[in-house]
Structures are given as C-alpha cells and as structure tokens.
UniProtKB/Swiss-Prot annotation:
Stretches assigned to the ZU5 domain: 322-456
PANTHER family: SH3 DOMAIN-BINDING PROTEIN 4 (PTHR15603:SF3), SH3 DOMAIN-CONTAINING PROTEIN (PTHR15603)
Physiological role: Possible role in regulating endocytosis of the transferrin receptor at the plasma membrane. Alternatively, may function as a negative regulator of the amino acid-induced TOR signaling by inhibiting the formation of active Rag GTPase complexes. Preferentially binds inactive Rag GTPase complexes and prevents their interaction with the mTORC1 complex inhibiting its relocalization to lysosomes and its activation. Thereby, may indirectly regulate cell growth, proliferation and autophagy.
PROSITE patterns in the record: SH3, ZU5
SUPFAM superfamilies: SH3-domain
Subunit (UniProt): Homodimer or homooligomer.
Species whose genome carries this gene: Danio rerio (Zebrafish)
GO molecular function annotation: GDP-dissociation inhibitor activity
Listed Pfam families: DEATH_SH3BP4, SH3_1, SH3_2, SH3BP4_C, UPA_SH3BP4, ZU5
Matches recorded under InterPro entries: DEATH_SH3BP4, SH3-like_dom_sf, SH3_domain, SH3BP4_C, SH3BP4_SH3, UPA_SH3BP4, ZU5_dom
Annotated SH3 domain residues: 56-115, 656-726
Protein name: SH3 domain-binding protein 4-A
Cell compartment(s), UniProt: Membrane, Clathrin-coated pit; Cytoplasmic vesicle, Clathrin-coated vesicle; Nucleus
Primary gene name: sh3bp4a
Length: 965
C-alpha cells in the first residue's frame, strides 16, 4: 500500500518521498483529526506552504554556500536557497525543510533572514544601530518586555494548513498558534502544552512581527500586521543600554545587556526568594565575595534550576562524557573507561623501551547522523581514542560489550565495528573484529593520533517495508537523574540511551537571558534499567511516587519520546517536576518509572529509591565550635538500632574460663620483646586461647599460644607448653587475671597506632546512640552536656562528637600530670560499653594505616608478598599521587600503600583476625622485615584474639537485644 502511494505521488510529479522520515499524506483527499494521530512527523505534502508563509514556528534562513549531503538524514541545498528551520537544539546541526523534504543542515552554511532579530544566529554583528536618533531608539528597542500584550493576528494559512491547529499530532510544533501568540495571557484555551523535551530548544522570543516603521523590517516568520503590533511597538523602551553605545554588539551580548536593564520575570519555583547578591548591597568587596559564595553554595545544594536564572524555562541538559587518560610504557597494560565495559589492551613492546605513550579514551553518547538510518543502527557509544606517541611497533585491541543480538531466523544483519578519523565520519568497517557472545574485540592497526570507533548493526538488504530493526534484538537504557539531596521542590531527568553506557552525572545549564552567569548543576544517576525495544516508536514515560506527600507534575506530552529520536540514536531527555505537599515533612521515597508503547502496552518499569534529604545541622553559635569542624557531619545517618541500644554494665570479676599448661623449657631472650614471654621450666601458665597463632620468631616461623604468666600477657611457643586442662593448679604463681587487668594488658599497643581523627569521629557518630553512656565510659561521670559543648545540640551524633572532642583535648593537654593515650582511652570506653564490633573495626583501620606509614617506601615489596601485585597494578596505585614531575614524594608514599592495603583487606573478607594475621605474616616474609623493630602489630594480634574472652567474662548474660552492635 505504502509503495503504491509513493509511486502514484512520484508519477504525478507532486512530491518525492522524504528521505529522513515521515508519512505521505494527500491533502486533497481530506485529512481528519483522527487520521493525523498516526502521523509521527510532518509529511512533505504538509510542507507545501506559500512562499510567504513558513511552517508553524519555523524560522526562515538562506543558504550562503552549497552543501552536498554525506548521508540520507542531511538535506541538500545550494547557495541562495531558502530553508525553514524547525529545531536548533543540535548545536552544529539544525533540522529544517525546503518545502519539499526535511533533514539536518549545518548551521554554518546558512544565515537567518533579517538576522538582526534572528534567534538562530549568535555570531552575527548588528551594526550602525547606535547611530540612530532618540526617536529611532524608541521604535527599535526590540528587546523590551511585552508583558500583558496579547497578539492574535489572523494568519492567512490558518484554514488551509491542517497542521496549524493540530500540534498534538506534530512533534515539530511547539504548540498551537494561539499558545505561541498568547503566551502572557491568563485565559488560555484548554489545549495540550508543548512537549517538554530537551531534545528541542524552544524559541527565545514568543513571536516576531513585521513593522515598516522607519523602514526597518523585523520578522521571525511573516504574518499580517494587526493593531496589536502597533501597541507592542509603542511599549518599546528607550533606556536600553544597547542604544547608548556606538559599538556593535553580538546577540549574546544583547541578551546580557537586556538582562541588566530589564527586571527578571518572577520565578514560579519553590526557592522563589533565592537571588544572587549585587555589589551595590555591600560596603566592601570581601562582604560581597562571602555573600556570593554562600548564594552559589545554596543554589547548588538545592538544585532548583529556577534559582540559577530567572528564566522560568528548563535548562539545556547534556551528559558528562566519561573519559580517562593513562600513560603506558613498553610493558603494555590495559586502560578501562570508568563505570563502563569498554577497555583497551596494549601488548608488551608496543613502544620502545624507555618510551611512553599517553592513551586518552572518551565515550561520546550522541552518535553522528551517518551511523543511524534504515540500514544501520549504533549499539555502543562512539569511543574517541587519542594517542600521543606514534612511534609504535604493534596494534592495540579495543574490547567492549554490546546489548544487542541479531535474529537467527533472518540472518540479514550483522554486527560491525566501524572506524573514522573524524567524529562526523565517514566511517569504514574494521576487518579485524571478533565477537564472543556479548563481547566484541577489535584489533586496531594503522593507528592515528585521533580515532573514533563504534559498534553498529548493519542490514545487508533493506526494502521499503523493513529496516535494520527487523533483524536485531536491541536493548535501550533508561536512566533516572536527580539532585544529591531531595528538597520540597526539585526536578528529575529521565534519559534514554541507545546503548548500556549511561553517565554517572548530567550537567544542567540554564538557557535564557542570564545563562552566562549561571554555573551548571550536576545531577546524579539514581538508577538505570535496560529493556528490549523491537522497533523505533513513540514511548510514553510515566513517573509515579509511592508516597502521597510527593506529587509528580508532568503533562502528557512531556512524557513522550518520539520514535524518530530513538531511530537517530540521540539521547532523549524528559523532565519531571516533583514537589511536596507538606514541605516540613520531607523524607526519601520510591519513584516508579513506567514505559508504554503507542498501543498503551507496558514495555518496562522499574523502581528507584531517592536520596535522603539534606541532614539538619545543629544550632549556629558565634562562639568557637570545636565539635562541628569536619564535613563528615553531613554524611551521618544514625542507625535505628543504635538509637534504642541499652549498653550493659562492665563487670569487674576474675576470669575463670581458662586452660592451664606446664612449661617444659626455660626461655630467656637476648633481644627483648614485650609481646613474647620469658619463662622458667616447670612453672604453670594460663592459656587465654587454644587457637594457635603462626608467626615468625627470632629465626623462623612458629606456632604460638596466648598465655598469662606472672602478671603479663604474651606469646609462648606451642612446643614449650604441656596443656593440663581447666583445673587451676594450686602452685600457680602470680595474681589472678581479672577483666580490668586483661583489658589494660591487651590495649597496650593501641597507643602506638596511627589514626585519622575525622574517620574515627564519623564512625562513632554513625554507630553510638547514647552520648551519656559514652561519657560515663570515658570517666566523665554525671557531667552535663554543657561541659562538652557551648550550645544545646538537637542531634545525638553531634553530642557524641562533642564528647569525643573533649577526650582529644584532654589527651593532648600537656599541663595535666597524668598522660592519657587517645587511642587507648577510646578503645577502653568502647569495650566497657560492649561495642566489640566497633573496636574491631577501628583497630583494623588503625593497623592498615599504621602499616602503610611504617612500610611506606617499601610498600611494593609488601604488595608482592601479600597479593603478587604486578608492576602495572603498582603503577596504577601510585598514579593518583604523582606530582607534576611524575614522581611520588617520599613523604606521600604512604598513600598508595594505604590504597593497596584497603583494597587487599576488602578481598580477604570480613574477619579482622584473618586480615591482621595475614598482614603480619606478609610483613614477616619481607627482606629485613619491619616487624623486627616495630613489634606492636604482634600486640594488636593478641588484642583481637582476646576480645571474645573479655566479653564473655565482663558482661553478665542478657537478651541479645540489649547488646550494642
């Protein structure tokens, strides 16, 4: 049927078929509203307008040079041709028609008609207007406010053009003509609003009219002048700074000058009163600088775009392209794009010995037009590869995963990797491409300094009734973006990608008069979902909240993504305004995103949990605030379990759950070690644990018991002890072991461990739910809260932090007679509160940091002993800490060591005993091990192995709910 209509149309010499997309419609047969519902884009017949009338809100331009298209989606034209631009959001490429067909045109090849008032040109200069008279300035102040003006000219093509009043069926029209002309009127007809898609850039001015006053003509699209035109011209202002200078201004400068002279429109957002300060409001520059920084911080935190610019429209949004830069030597290696499945493998000997090559990779999310048409469709981002050193000896391999499969029942398409030296093409297939399941490996030779590589599905044959989508199963990705914290009113963005590479952030910039003064806002990826899309079609994206307090505001057309956008592979974005009915009751909630096709069938849906609202800080005080210095306060979320915790009472009692042994050898050590016991043959020793610890002694590795001998706790060689049993011999020498004595003995090595105070503070604020119990355990008994801080605090975590700050001050006070160790006092208090898990976590953090500091210049040796880390991996650990000369300073060498130890400990597992034990053994295997001079890691190992014994002895049996976690 479609082919027959095309042939009839062509034989009658009426119109050729549109090359990019569209449905053929014969206007003479009559078009009803119902029949136009199925129209995806304007047909060529609908574009046969009179020369003096353009298509809806299209802007007329003239070609200044010839252009021959390189793909079917672009439009061919010659110098002097008149074109009508429908969409300018593409930047370098505009979407236009020439009364015969539609397609993309390069913006640099055309010039707007009457470009002195054109919204399409930002580089043209407006000359000689500064020389006009005062009367001319009155009539030519084209940028004045038109508030209250209602323009409804009678357009000559209203009755003849079926598309002029059917904006709901035409994705290229921003709205009905009445909506455009009566933008400021309070009484608007009940019609569908314009599609709130960031894929299109709405015109900056509501309408342009034609005036012959003083011989000047200003037109966006021609129409019949009415009395409203004259009323509008009488409202033009003469105090515009544009007319006060003799120089020429670009349209960008005009928008800035107009923003300075005209008061901005009132914002309809939640943060209505948030306005940038002006220098005139302050007496000195420093006060203005402080106020400006505070405003900027507040504006970025609330993420309300209307606070960044007074234009009530939504800003232009673009994804942050994922990129990485790495330098490799002759040993080769691998470079992977962060948060993607895209990597480059460089073989050994790729460059000469002593040379290096810098490799830069970037994922470009919007593919060029050449790669998406009826025959071809991209299934990966375009990967930009830049190489610095071209003196190479081998090829490199690009590996990436794709979310597509070709249909086995119709082998008419294949997955192809294409390459080009330019972003816009032309692209040619890469022969050395190998596919393994969903992974494709590409062998790149004939390397260039800059290359662009993409994976596409290409159909071998295309007919009028089928395209490449009929021969593949393709997945698209839906990403939901929003601010870091939710607020009573905020905006979210739903983005659709033609591949599985969704960026972690979206940058949002305000589009309007004050766009240049507004910094971009970064929206974070809340969640993403993949689903199979059988063909390019209109998708209805709905968003729903699971809480009645939050309302999602979006009209029906703002929920639609057009099929031709998906076909072109462009990133489509939808905006949803979410507001709270009760601004004082804000909490996180769940958003459900639902995708429906044009038949109202559900294709996919998924749920995303929103972030938390920003935490409330304590009362501000002009006095010194020693407990709110760190940024970690904003990250504290107190566990619900910690709030209801009842901390048990530490009991002073003798430890009875012990085994005893007889020493069968006398040991006197020449090199003293406070954690290795000295003993006499025939004496009795108490064994705190039957578990054997494998450590290196003076010469070789041995197995050890933890023993208690004559008031001292330490290690004893297993072969030197004959285990007797649990009955205490009568000739046992030394004092009985009590819980307090055990705690004092095992906490001795804590004072020699290195710690980061901010990290300790954060962990305690997150896990302690009772500042009173914490203060009592630190011997601050019955002291009021004002003893620790100067202001009353509403937050329990901040109260805990104030007690911790007081402990730190007392330990660092040099005037006190009794010297205290911060680490030991803290651990003792936590053990008295039965927070054994918290002690184990802090001890492991202290041990890893202390080891990194002690072993800093020799950390590579330790990494090789612990995990057999390769040279390339070691370089990767040091890369973030190199200075401008490419070297890691000796004083900063602990940083890569700490990064490695954290990664290694996470791979070992959750057992803090195993981590410390394996670390000790790894240090023992080093050449000239540091454990020979630094003995306190041995004491720490004794500590973590005695925690269970201490807890079972110091606390009476109680229900599990009464213990702290």
């Amino acid at each position: 049927m479609a082919a027959h209509r095309i042939r009839v149309t062509n034989n009658n010499n009426v119109l050729p078929r549109c090359k990019s997309e569209g449905t053929l419609i014969d206007i003479d047969e009559g078009v009803t509203e119902a029949s136009l519902v199925d129209v995806k884009v304007p047909s060529p017949s609908a574009l046969r307008l009179a020369p003096s009338t353009s298509f809806g809100t299209a802007r007329e331009v003239v070609a200044i040079k010839d252009y021959c298209p390189s793909s079917f989606t672009t439009l061919k034209f010659s110098k002097g041709d008149h074109l009508y631009v429908l969409d300018t959001s593409g930047g370098e490429w505009w979407y236009a028609h020439n009364n015969r067909e539609m397609g993309y045109i390069p913006s640099t090849y055309v010039q707007p008609i009457n470009y002195r008032n054109s919204s399409l040109s930002d580089s043209g200069m407006i000359d000689n207007l500064g020389d006009c008279s005062e009367e001319g300035a009155k009539e030519l102040d084209l940028l004045g406010e038109w508030t209250g003006v209602c323009l409804k000219p009678s357009l000559p093509y209203d009755n003849n053009n079926p598309f002029s009043m059917l904006s709901s069926t035409n994705p290229f029209l921003n709205g009905s003509m009445d909506d455009v002309l009566d933008q400021n009127s309070n009484e608007k007809p009940n019609q569908c609003n314009s599609m709130d898609l960031l894929f299109f850039d709405l015109p900056s001015a509501p309408i342009s009219t034609t005036s012959n006053t003083k011989g000047y003509s200003i037109s966006g699209f021609d129409g019949t002048s009415t009395s409203a035109d004259l009323e509008a011209l009488q409202m033009l202002r003469k105090d515009n700074p544009f007319f006060r200078s003799k120089r020429s201004y670009s349209l960008s400068e005009l928008s800035t000058l107009q923003a300075q002279s005209n008061p901005p429109l009132p914002s309809s957002g939640f943060f209505t009163g948030l306005k940038a300060p002006s220098p005139e409001q302050f007496q000195n520059r420093e006060d203005f600088r402080t106020a400006w920084l505070n405003h900027r911080k507040l504006a970025r935190s609330c993420h309300d775009l209307e606070s960044l610019g007074q234009n009530p429209g939504w800003g232009q949004t673009q994804p942050v392209e994922t990129n990485i830069v790495c330098k490799l030597d002759s040993c080769g290696g691998a470079v992977q794009l962060p948060d993607t499945n895209i990597s480059i493998h460089v073989p050994e000997g790729h460059v000469a010995v002593g040379d290096t090559q810098q490799i830069s990779m970037k994922a470009l999310l919007d593919p060029p037009l050449e790669l998406n048409n009826d025959r071809c469709s991209t299934v990966s981002p375009v990967v930009e590869i830049k190489l610095s050193n071209m003196e190479i000896k081998s090829f490199i391999t690009l590996e990436m995963k794709v979310s597509v499969m070709t249909r086995t029942e119709s082998p008419m398409a294949e997955i192809v990797c294409v390459r080009s030296d330019c972003k816009e093409g032309p692209y040619s297939p890469v022969p050395q491409a190998y596919i393994y399941g969903d992974t494709i490996q590409v062998q790149l030779d004939n390397l260039e300094p800059c290359m662009y590589v993409a994976v596409v599905v290409q159909a071998k044959h295309v007919s009028f009734s089928s395209n490449v989508w009929n021969h593949m199963v393709k997945k698209v990705t839906l990403g939901l973006y929003g601010p870091k914290h939710i607020h009573p009113s905020f905006k979210t963005v739903v983005a659709i990608f033609g591949h599985d590479c969704a960026p972690k952030t979206l940058l949002v910039s305000e589009v309007g008069k004050q766009a240049k003064s507004a910094p971009p806002v970064s929206l974070q990826l809340w969640g993403k979902h993949q689903f199979v899309l059988s063909r390019p079609q209109d998708l209805q994206i709905g968003m729903y909240s699971n809480m009645s307090n939050y309302e999602v505001k979006a009209n029906d057309q703002a929920r639609v993504v057009r099929g031709f956008q998906i076909k072109l592979g462009k990133v489509s974005r939808l905006i949803y305004m979410i507001s709270s009915r009760k601004a004082d009751e804000i909490s996180d909630f769940t958003l459900r995103v639902q995708v429906k096709d044009d038949q109202d069938c559900i294709l996919a849906q998924f749920c995303v949990q929103t972030p938390q609202p920003p935490p409330k800080t304590g009362m501000r005080n002009n006095g010194q605030r020693r407990f709110l210095k760190k940024k970690e306060v904003d990250k504290i979320i107190l566990s619900p379990l910690a709030i209801t915790t009842k901390y048990p009472q530490f009991q002073e009692r003798c430890i009875t759950n012990l085994k005893f042994g007889k020493l069968i050898k006398t040991v006197i050590r020449q090199t003293k070690n406070q954690y290795l016991l000295e003993y006499k043959k025939g004496d009795i020793i108490a064994l705190l644990s039957e578990e054997k610890i494998k450590l290196k002694g003076q010469l070789w590795t041995k197995e050890w018991y933890i023993g208690y001998y004559q008031g001292k706790i330490g290690l004893v060689h297993v072969k030197n002890v004959l285990v007797l049993g649990k009955v205490k011999p009568i000739y046992f020498c030394g004092p009985d072991l009590t819980t307090t004595m055990l705690m004092e003995q095992i906490l001795k090595p804590c004072k020699f461990l290195t710690y980061i105070y901010a990290s300790v503070r954060t962990i305690l604020m997150e896990n302690l739910g009772n500042w009173r119990a914490f203060a009592d355990a630190l011997s601050y008994v019955n002291l009021p809260l004002t003893y620790f801080c100067r202001a009353e605090l509403d937050s329990e975590p901040e109260r805990v932090a104030s007690v911790l700050e007081k402990l730190k001050e007392d330990c660092l006070n040099m005037e006190t007679k009794e010297k205290k160790s911060f680490q030991k006092e803290l651990m003792m208090a936590l053990l008295k509160m039965d927070c054994q898990g918290l002690v184990a976590r802090l001890i492991m953090d202290f041990v890893l940091l202390t080891t990194a500091v002690e072993v800093a210049p020799r950390w590579r040796d330790l990494a090789e002993k612990l995990a057999h880390v390769s040279k390339q991996q070691m370089e990767a650990y040091e890369a973030p800490h190199r200075d401008k000369t490419g070297m890691v300073d000796s004083e900063a060498m602990w940083k890569p060591a700490y990064d490695f130890l954290l990664t290694w400990a996470a791979q070992i597992g959750d057992s803090y005993r195993d981590v410390i034990h394996e670390l000790h053994m790894g240090l023992d295997r080093m050449k000239n091990p540091i454990t020979k001079r630094w003995k306190h890691l041995t004491g720490t190992l004794i500590l973590v192995n005695c925690l269970d014994l201490l807890r079972s002895s110091a606390f009476s049996p109680a229900p599990q709910d009464d213990f702290a976690i």
